[in-house]
Design a protein with these regions (language model features):
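Catalytic-domain carbohydrate-binding cleft regions of carbohydrate-active enzymes
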Residues: 1-301, 455-622, 627-708
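Catalytic and substrate-binding regions of extracellular carbohydrate-active enzymes
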Residues: 243, 247, 255-503
Length: 708
C-alpha cells in the first residue's frame, strides 16, 4: 500500500504528547441505542457535544463514534447531516454479528438524499483497524482499547506509533482526530468515490430495552411530553437547552438511551435461577442485591430528568409547562389501576364472547377469541376488509413465552461470531431449574361492554373489556402475571381502535421469559424494488414499501430493506409519527381489492418483532398444561417471535425465529407484528429479572390501530 500520510487515532481522551494532537470529542455524549430516542432528543445529544466544542474552542466534531453496540439505524443520517456531522464510526462488540458492509463506505438515506461516511469494524472496537480508500494517500489507524479496559498508557501509544512507522516506512505517521482524517479524504476526492450503501442496518442488541419495561415506558413518556411542549410553546422555549433547567433535564433524559443499564453481574452466578433460589440469593448471596441496585440507579435518571425541571422557578415558562406535561405522561404509565367492571355503577355490561359484534358505526364485524382473549375478526365498513388474520384468533392477544437453555444455544450458534454462553445465554439453567419451551395463552374468564356516552352519535368510543387468567404454575414457578386485562375502544368517528393491556401481579423471575401482544394482520402486499430519492434538503415522496414500514427518529424505513446480518426482525419503533404510526403495512384488500393500510402505534413498549406468517405452524388452543406452540409441533417453528435480529438457517426445532442471511421476505400475503412487553433474555447489560422494585408488579401498555 502506498501511504503518504497515516493518521493515528487513539480514542477521545488518552493521548501521547510526542505523537498525538490535543484531545477532541466525538459527536454524541456516549454509546447509545439511538432507536430508543426520538428525533428531537437524539439531536439534542449531538448539540451537547457541539456546545462543548464551542466552549473549549475546538472545531465541531464531524464524526459520531459508537463502540460495543453492533449497529444503529439509518434514521440517524438526516439528523446528523442537519448538524454538520459528516461521518460515523462503529466498533461492534467482538462476539456479535454486524451488518455486512465495507470497512468504509458512504451510507445514504434515500428519502432525504443525505449521507454520511460510515466506518465499521465488525470484529471489535478497532484496536488494529487501518482504513484506506481508493486513490487516496491518506489512511487511518485506530487504537481503541477493549471493553471496560480504560485508555492506553503513553508508553503503549508510543510503542504503537513506532510499530506503524516501521510497518509503513514511506508514510508520515502522525496523531489524528476524527475530523482530520475525514477532512483529508474529502479534500482529495476519495470520499466521493466510496462504495454506497442505502439499506437499514439496525441494532441487534435492542431486544434488551424491554428488560426494564417501566424505564422504557417512562422514557417514552418524557419524550412525548417534550414534543407536546415544543408543539405548544416552540423549540426556543421548550427544546434542547432552552433554559438551564431544560438543558439539565435533557442531559438526564438522554442517559435513558445509554446502552448499558447497570452492573454486568449475572454471568457470575449459574445456580440461582428458580424464583425460590433468586429470593434466597437476593438476601444472602454477595452481588445479587448490589447488581439490582445498579439497575435502580440507571432507572433513577427518570426521576433526575423530572427533578431538574422541578428545580426551575416559575419564571421559566418552558420548564414549568414541560414539568406539567411530563408528570401527566408519567402518571399514565405508573402503577396502573386494575379495572373493576363488576363494581356497582361501573357502567359495564356482561358480554358473550362467542357473539359477533355487528352494530359498531365504523366496523361491520368484530369477532372475539372466546377461549384465550383477543380478536378473531376485524372488518371495517368502508373497506370491507378483515384486518385480523383470524386463524387462531390471536389478534391483540397477550401471550407468555418460556424458554430452555437449548433455545439459547441455538440462538448463539446462529447469531454470534464466537460462542459466548455466559453473556448471551443461560448457562447451567438445565441443571438448576425445570423449564419448558413454549408459548402460553391464558383463559378468558370474563368480558364486558360499555356503550359510548354520546349514544348513537359519531362521538366517543364503544368499549369492550376482557379478563384473561393465567395458569397458576406459569404465575408461581415462572414470571407470568396472575391475570391480564385488555381494553378495546372502538371509535365511532373513524376506523380506529385504542387498546390497553394491563398486567396484574407479575412474578419476579430469573427464568427466561417474554411477554407479547400479537398483531397478526391480513394485508396482501406486492413486491416492489423501486427506490425514490429526493434532492439535498428536500425529502422525496416515501418509496412504496412491500413490507412493514417502521417509524424511527422521524423517518419511515422499510423492514424488507435491511442489510445482510443487520437487524431484520427486531426493531425499536417510535410513537412520534402521527401519519404512519409506529409500524404500518399497506396493500390490497376487501371485495374490490382496494388499497388498505394497517397502522399500529405502540406508546409504552418500544420493541417490535416481525415474522412472516406463511411459515408459521398453526396455533392450536389447548389446555394450559401445554403451550400454544412447542418444539414437538413441527420440524421447524419459523415464526414464533423471539428477540433475534436475523436468520442464518431455517431447519432447527426451536422457539427462536432462526436468523436468516437474507432480507425479510417480500410480498407475503400476511405477516405478524409482535410487540414485546417484557423479557429477560440478555444476561449482560440489562436487568435479569423483573420486577426488581416494589410497586412494579402491575404494568400497562397502550396501542392504537388506524385502519384505512
Amino acid at each position: 500500500m502506498r501511504c503518504a500520510n497515516l493518521y493515528f487515532g487513539v480514542g477521545v481522551d488518552v493521548v501521547a504528547r510526542d505523537c498525538c494532537p490535543a484531545p477532541s470529542c466525538q459527536a454524541f455524549p456516549f454509546n447509545a441505542e439511538p432507536e430508543t430516542c426520538d428525533a428531537e432528543l437524539f439531536g439534542a445529544g449531538v448539540d451537547i457535544c457541539h456546545e462543548l466544542d464551542d466552549r473549549f474552542g475546538r472545531p465541531r466534531s464531524q464524526v459520531l463514534s459508537q463502540r460495543d453496540v453492533p449497529g444503529l439505524t439509518r434514521a440517524v443520517i438526516p439528523l446528523l447531516a442537519a448538524r454538520g456531522v459528516t461521518a460515523l464510526s462503529i466498533g461492534a462488540n467482538t462476539f456479535s454479528a454486524s451488518a455486512d458492509v465495507p470497512p468504509i463506505y458512504r451510507w445514504r438515506d434515500p428519502a432525504s438524499n443525505t449521507s454520511v461516511i460510515a466506518m465499521q469494524n465488525p470484529g471489535g472496537y478497532g484496536d488494529r483497524l487501518t482504513l484506506t480508500t481508493d486513490g487516496s494517500a491518506h489512511a487511518l489507524h485506530l487504537m481503541f482499547n477493549g471493553d471496560n479496559a480504560g485508555g492506553h498508557s503513553p508508553a503503549q501509544v508510543a510503542a504503537r506509533h513506532a510499530e506503524l512507522a516501521k510497518r509503513f516506512p514511506n508514510a508520515r505517521v502522525s496523531g489524528a482526530t476524527w475530523n482530520s482524517y475525514i477532512d483529508a479524504i474529502t479534500a482529495d476526492g476519495s470520499a466521493a468515490r466510496l462504495p454506497e450503501v442505502d439499506k437499514e442496518e439496525g441494532d441487534t442488541w435492542v431486544y434488551g430495552v424491554q428488560q426494564d419495561l417501566y424505564k422504557t415506558a417512562a422514557f417514552r413518556a418524557i419524550m412525548r411530553a417534550r414534543r407536546r411542549c415544543i408543539a405548544e410553546l416552540g423549540y426556543p422555549i421548550c427544546g434542547g437547552n432552552a433554559s438551564a433547567a431544560i438543558a439539565n433535564s435533557t442531559r438526564f433524559a438522554l442517559k435513558l438511551s445509554e446502552h448499558t443499564w447497570g452492573f454486568n453481574w449475572g454471568y457470575m452466578d449459574e445456580v440461582h435461577y428458580t424464583n425460590t433460589d433468586l429470593a434466597y440469593a437476593l438476601a444472602n448471596v454477595e452481588g445479587f442485591a448490589t447488581t439490582q441496585n445498579g439497575w435502580r440507579e440507571q432507572r433513577a435518571y427518570v426521576a433526575h430528568a423530572v427533578g431538574a425541571l422541578a428545580a426551575a422557578g416559575a419564571a421559566d415558562v418552558g420548564a414549568s409547562r414541560l414539568l406539567e406535561l411530563t408528570k401527566e405522561e408519567l402518571a399514565a404509565v405508573t402503577r396502573p389501576t386494575e379495572p373493576t367492571p363488576t363494581a356497582p355503577a361501573s357502567g359495564w355490561t356482561t358480554v358473550d364472547p362467542t357473539k359477533r359484534i355487528t352494530d359498531l358505526p365504523r366496523f361491520a364485524n368484530v369477532a372475539w377469541n372466546a377461549t384465550a382473549g383477543g380478536i378473531g375478526s376485524l372488518t371495517t365498513k368502508e373497506q370491507g376488509h378483515d384486518y385480523a388474520r383470524g386463524r387462531g384468533g390471536s389478534f391483540g392477544q397477550y401471550q407468555y413465552q418460556t424458554l430452555t437453555e437449548n433455545d439459547f444455544w441455538v440462538f448463539m450458534n446462529e447469531t454470534l461470531k464466537v460462542q459466548r454462553d455466559v453473556a448471551f445465554g443461560k448457562k447451567n439453567l438445565t441443571n438448576n431449574a425445570n423449564v419448558t419451551s413454549g408459548f402460553w395463552a391464558g383463559t378468558l374468564s370474563g368480558m364486558w361492554s360499555k356503550k359510548a356516552a354520546g349514544g348513537d352519535t359519531d362521538e366517543g368510543v364503544d368499549s369492550f373489556l376482557q379478563r384473561v387468567d393465567m395458569d397458576a404454575h406459569l404465575h408461581g414457578y415462572y414470571g407470568a402475571p396472575s391475570r391480564v386485562w385488555t381494553l378495546f375502544e372502538f371509535s365511532r368517528a373513524t376506523a380506529t381502535v385504542n387498546i390497553s393491556v394491563t398486567l396484574v401481579n407479575k412474578t419476579t423471575t430469573r427464568l427466561p421469559e417474554a411477554h407479547w401482544v400479537d398483531f397478526e394482520v391480513a394485508v396482501p402486499v406486492t413486491p416492489n424494488d423501486d427506490v425514490v430519492s429526493g434532492t439535498a434538503g428536500t425529502p422525496a415522496p416515501p418509496p412504496v414499501c412491500d413490507s412493514w414500514s417502521l417509524s424511527k427518529l422521524g423517518s419511515s424505513l422499510c423492514a424488507s430493506d435491511v442489510s445482510l446480518f443487520g437487524s431484520t426482525h427486531i426493531h425499536a419503533v417510535s410513537d412520534s409519527d402521527a401519519e404512519h404510526g409506529s409500524v404500518s403495512i399497506s396493500g390490497r384488500g376487501g371485495a374490490d381489492a382496494a388499497a388498505v393500510t394497517f397502522r399500529l402505534t405502540t406508546y409504552d413498549a418500544a420493541l417490535l418483532s416481525l415474522e412472516c406468517v406463511h411459515s408459521v405452524i398453526s396455533l392450536h388452543c389447548r389446555p394450559l398444561s401445554t403451550p400454544l406452540c412447542s418444539h414437538a409441533d413441527s420440524f421447524a417453528l419459523l415464526s414464533i417471535p423471539m428477540p433475534v435480529p436475523f436468520r442464518l438457517f431455517t431447519r432447527y426445532k426451536t422457539a427462536f425465529p432462526n436468523p436468516v442471511h437474507k432480507d425479510l421476505d417480500k410480498g407475503r400475503a400476511a405477516e405478524q407484528a409482535y410487540i414485546c412487553l417484557c423479557n429477560n433474555f440478555w444476561t449482560t447489560n440489562y436487568p435479569n429479572w423483573y420486577p426488581f422494585m416494589e410497586g412494579d408488579e402491575d404494568a400497562i401498555f397502550r396501542f392504537q390501530l388506524q385502519l384505512s
